[in-house]
Amino acid sequence: MAKMMGPRFKMCRRLGLNVVGHPKAMKRADRGTSRADKKLSDYGIQLLEKQRLRAYYGVMERQFTRYVDQAFNSKEQPGEALLMILESRLDNMVYRMGFASSIRQARQMVNHGHFLVNGKKVNIPSFRLNIGDEVVLREKSRKTEMFVNNFKDSIGSEVPYISKEEDNFKGIFARKPKREEIPITIQEQLIVEFYSK
């Protein structure tokens, strides 16, 4: 399986966006260290925004391009459709539900088979959830203190399109998110323009 490699904090500073979720990722960022601080052409600005979004969700270029194609073929605005596709990935939902402290950690947990989706084991991070799907931490995985603490510590801080059942270690993709509810600072229209050329 292909992975995004390289120093993660350095990548955050270069992109001018905390794409790993770690509170110290941007700590050493000085003005002038990110591409966002440099004068860029319109193309450069669009490319940077695309790289930011791809890095945030940890998606490889080929897969990201497929998502873009799907977004352009949908009936919704391409930018918002792209965000919805990325947001509904299982690894991201595991993160949003509070089982993991980062999307990267969530991806590892999914790969290792720690979750059931609607009662069935799913170990594919890119698996797309539908509205109403339930994600449950497996019984044997509840013996891992870190997983349990992550979930319980996140109670009350989840995004509004997710509901949780603390006693059952369950998260539910309750409804389609509104754009303003997705907690990522990105200008998706720039990405649409990048792929419209």
UniProtKB/Swiss-Prot annotation:
Cellular-component GO terms for this entry: small ribosomal subunit
A biological process term (GO) from this entry: translation
Gene Ontology molecular-function annotations: rRNA binding; structural constituent of ribosome
UniProt domain S4 RNA-binding: residue ranges: 88-150
Any Pfam family: S4
InterPro entries (alphabetical): Ribosomal_uS4 (IPR022801), Ribosomal_uS4_bac-type (IPR005709), Ribosomal_uS4_CS (IPR018079), Ribosomal_uS4_N (IPR001912), S4_RNA-bd (IPR002942), S4_RNA-bd_sf (IPR036986)
UniProt entry keywords in alphabetical sequence: Ribonucleoprotein, Ribosomal protein, RNA-binding, rRNA-binding
Family: Belongs to the universal ribosomal protein uS4 family.
Record note on quaternary structure: Part of the 30S ribosomal subunit. Contacts protein S5. The interaction surface between S4 and S5 is involved in control of translational fidelity.
Record's function text: One of the primary rRNA binding proteins, it binds directly to 16S rRNA where it nucleates assembly of the body of the 30S subunit. With S5 and S12 plays an important role in translational accuracy.
Name used for this protein in its record: Small ribosomal subunit protein uS4B
The organism of origin for this protein: Clostridium perfringens (strain SM101 / Type A)
Gene: rpsD2
